[in-house]
């Protein structure tokens, strides 16, 4: 079973023109299909505006497809009742991690997601320890995110998802 299956994905942004209040559609993704197995390393390359971030948002169920289908862990991203479970499975780290770091210290940032999912405090503590160890950031647990380098901030953002 694939971890991610994308079949004939289509996504159109709706834009509204100012004066005429006319709806204009812009196709960001047109007929993309791919499969990713657990453990695969995948890179998505393309020019600015080619749909890379839009695809990532689709995989994390932050946007609904205009057409086609996406399965993440066997769950359909278009089904409202499965979105929370998909978001527990797939996370997104933005290009500029400053936009998603909100805690006063690193461990608060790493704990933010699990706290919002209602995970018990003891489990959150274990997850923080494991996530920071896996990204090599254990020594920065009590540090202010503002004092970290850009690469360190990205590692903290990854630890948080």
Go through the PLM ranges and name each one.
Residues 43, 156-161:
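ABC ATPase nucleotide-binding domain "signature" region
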Residues 144-148, 152:
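Conserved ABC ATPase signature
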Residues 60:
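Helix-to-loop junction immediately C-terminal to a conserved catalytic motif
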Residues 68-78, 86:
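Conserved ABC transporter NBD signature motif
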Residues 122-140:
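Conserved ABC ATPase "signature" region
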Residues 45-47:
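The feature captures the beta-strand-to-loop junction immediately N-terminal to the Walker
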Residues 98, 104-115, 125, 129:
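Short helical segment in ABC ATPase nucleotide-binding domains corresponding to the A-loop/adjacent helical element
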């Amino acid at each position: 079973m694939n971890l991610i299956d994308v079949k004939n994905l289509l996504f159109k942004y709706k834009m509204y023109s100012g004066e005429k209040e006319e709806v204009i559609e812009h196709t960001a993704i047109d007929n993309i299909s791919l499969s990713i197995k657990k453990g695969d390393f995948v890179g998505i390359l393309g020019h600015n505006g080619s749909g890379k971030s839009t695809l990532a948002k689709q995989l994390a169920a932050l946007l609904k497809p205009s057409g086609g289908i996406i399965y993440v862990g066997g769950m359909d991203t278009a089904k409202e009742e499965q979105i929370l479970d998909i978001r527990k499975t797939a996370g997104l780290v933005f290009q500029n991690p400053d936009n998603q770091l909100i805690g006063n210290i690193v461990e608060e940032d790493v704990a933010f997601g699990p706290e919002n999912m209602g995970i018990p405090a003891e489990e959150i503590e274990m997850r923080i320890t494991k996530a920071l160890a896996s990204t090599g950031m254990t020594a920065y647990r009590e540090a202010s995110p503002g004092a970290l380098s850009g690469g360190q901030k990205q590692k903290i953002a990854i630890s948080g998802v």
